[in-house]
Amino acid sequence: MSGNVAIRTIGDTVLGKGTVYTQAASTAASSGDNTVVAAPSAGNHLVVKDLMVQNESSTETTVILKSGSTAKWRGKLAANAALSLSFAVGEEWRLGTAEALVLNLSGANSHGYSIRYRTEAD
């Protein structure tokens, strides 16, 4: 027997075009916490599929990605360097309930960002 098999889900996770994401792209330049995606309502959390942050300044900057006030990823970005995170289906970064995605910068240096995410019920 020959033919194609269409896999549309893995467990409860819908694959492909079944998932709708929102795209956020802008620049953060304030030292300290910069909210890049607002917190969803109670009983919901953000699910990050892809994230890119680029240091657009000439100054090395420590970057901390947070779920609300909790640091989840930390690193130093050299001048004009970027980080890129892309998560496989089912392995996306799930933030805490009703918590914003926050980009903390060690200095007032311009950083561009692009984020693809969705909101999911707890």
Cite the ranges covered by each PLM segment.
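Beta-strand-centric surfaces of beta-sandwich/beta-rich domains
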Residues: 1-122
